[in-house]
Amino acid sequence: MEIVRTIAEADCAARALPRPLGLVPTMGALHDGHLALVARARATCASVMATIFVNPLQFGPNEDFAKYPRAFPEDARRLEAAGVDLLFAPSVAEMYPTGFDTTVDPGAVGTRYEGALRPGHFRGVATVCAKLFAIAGAERA
């Protein structure tokens, strides 16, 4: 499994993989549900790319981004054992450089369900997913 940290590296590595490419975005702290998604991608795609990125945009002001569990070495080992070909694990600065201000507005759903209790949560999720999908260029997710 190749591990990359920059958008340029991820773009280059993903383009080189056999198609179709399946993308499994995560924030790490992997559980069996994540691994089931990897297994599904492995069964239906020629290549699998996973991401580990704890996205600060989906945490509200009273939520503790800093305390979100991070176990990169163990998560990477589990993803490799599950058959992931490429792991993209960028820094916050890589995903949201100084001056970044483009976000995805999820519309009304952003204020319903979990969004009613966590303002901005769905905007953060939609933004990071759009960025990860664009970087990966995957056919399936």
Predicted segments, located by residue:
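Nucleotidyltransferase catalytic core that binds NTPs
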Residues: M1-A141
